[in-house]
Amino acid sequence: MTGDVLRLDWRSAILHSAFNILHWKVLGNIPYYITTPIIELALRERPALIVLLVQDEVADRIVSAPGSKTYGGLSVGAQVEAQVEKLFTVKAGSFTPPPKVHSAVIRLRPLLRPLVAPPDVPAFRAFVAACFSLRRKTLRNVLRSITSRPAEVVDAALAELGVEPRARAETLVPERFVALWRWSR
């Protein structure tokens, strides 16, 4: 198959291939500049497994835990849909010609029950992106800003969800982002 991976109808390609398999996998050494769109597309299509060679820094962002410097929207977005693992790094010298960056192999196992239903993923990702775009603000102020709700309403929701009002987006686990997003709708 040749073509633009971002424009390919993956399901149709699989159904009309000689393999016609139900439990298909995505494996690849992908162009680093389109890593995020490829991962988002692959997760939307729900293969049994995704294994990709990506830039090492991107791998770190995908698998990051709350509180780390690399934790952000990419981490949350991937982790609400899949179990993510960084398997190993690949040095630049492993390639000819060697790239200017190190690489890593990541594995994403799509969750049988993702924390966000597939049709809602774009709205959830937009919510998370808005939270991280105001990274230095407290969640209380972020939620007031993006929902236009009064402080007392936001405070009550944070208390009900067990989120400290002074917490910042980079400290929140993916499950809490899902809860806040559901409240904000």
Model-predicted segments: where are they?
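Alpha-helix boundary/capping detector
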Residues: 88, 153-154, 165, 169, ...
